[in-house]
């Protein structure tokens, strides 16, 4: 997906729909699939980028260069490196890159993905967004996450030593979460001088998720709005 702004700069969103597992709260377009044919995906992404470029030309849309590329998902850090490399090369050839282009990619704190950070940086990724979600192992288990608190902390440390721009995602206001734990997590990351951004998401129960099914069956508790507001404040 391409987006233009008033300065005629382009932003590009690339979606990778696969994850190692489906989180119980997630209603995004994501699927569990261990089979991936890199050549077929490269062909598909290339064709899509060519189509986008043709649409811009056909509609006489004037633009300068790409100033941002965002790889989302799903879990795009699971993408084979050759696919990412092909996308970036094709996008650069078709649209051009601003000198200070931001190329961002979402990642989970698993050891497999952490080991790819150096390779991703060499390909041109200069911003990483890590789905930490919590630093409490019990809360991570409730949220269906496959990493531990230690995994998350090690991944963040490796990320800040690899990338100049690192963001962390956290989830709050879910049943069983303690306000003290939440406050401590915020303090850990707010005191981290090498982090550029925190994204905080209140847990919502969305249709089509396992949490929604459990909630409708009376198997999942949710906290009341007043207590949720305490986490926000």
Question: Could you tell me what each predicted segment is?
Answer:
Residues 30-57, 61, 65-233:
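Conserved non-cysteine loop/helix-boundary elements of the Radical SAM core domain that shape
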Residues 9-11, 23, 102:
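Structural motif
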């Amino acid at each position: 997906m391409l987006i233009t702004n008033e300065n005629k700069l382009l932003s590009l969103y690339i979606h990778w729909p696969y994850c190692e597992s489906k989180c119980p709260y997630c209603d995004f377009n994501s699927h569990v699939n261990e089979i991936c044919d890199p050549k077929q995906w490269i062909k598909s992404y290339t064709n899509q980028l060519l189509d986008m470029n043709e649409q811009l030309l056909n509609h006489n849309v004037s633009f300068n260069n790409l100033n941002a590329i965002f790889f989302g998902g799903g879990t795009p850090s699971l993408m084979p490196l050759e696919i990412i490399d092909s996308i970036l090369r094709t996008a650069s050839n078709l649209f051009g890159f601003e000198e200070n282009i931001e190329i961002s990619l979402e990642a989970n704190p698993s050891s497999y993905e952490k080991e790819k950070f150096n390779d991703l940086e060499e390909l041109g990724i200069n911003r990483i967004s890590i789905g930490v979600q919590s630093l409490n192992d019990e809360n991570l288990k409730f949220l269906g996450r496959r990493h531990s608190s230690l995994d998350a902390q090690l991944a963040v440390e490796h990320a800040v030593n690899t990338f100049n721009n690192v963001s962390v995602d956290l989830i709050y206001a879910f049943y069983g979460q303690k306000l003290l734990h939440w406050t401590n997590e915020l303090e850990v990351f707010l005191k981290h001088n090498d982090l550029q951004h925190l994204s905080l998401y209140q847990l919502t129960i969305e249709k089509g998720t396992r949490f929604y099914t459990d909630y409708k069956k009376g198997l999942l508790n949710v906290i009341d709005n007043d207590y949720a507001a305490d986490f926000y404040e």
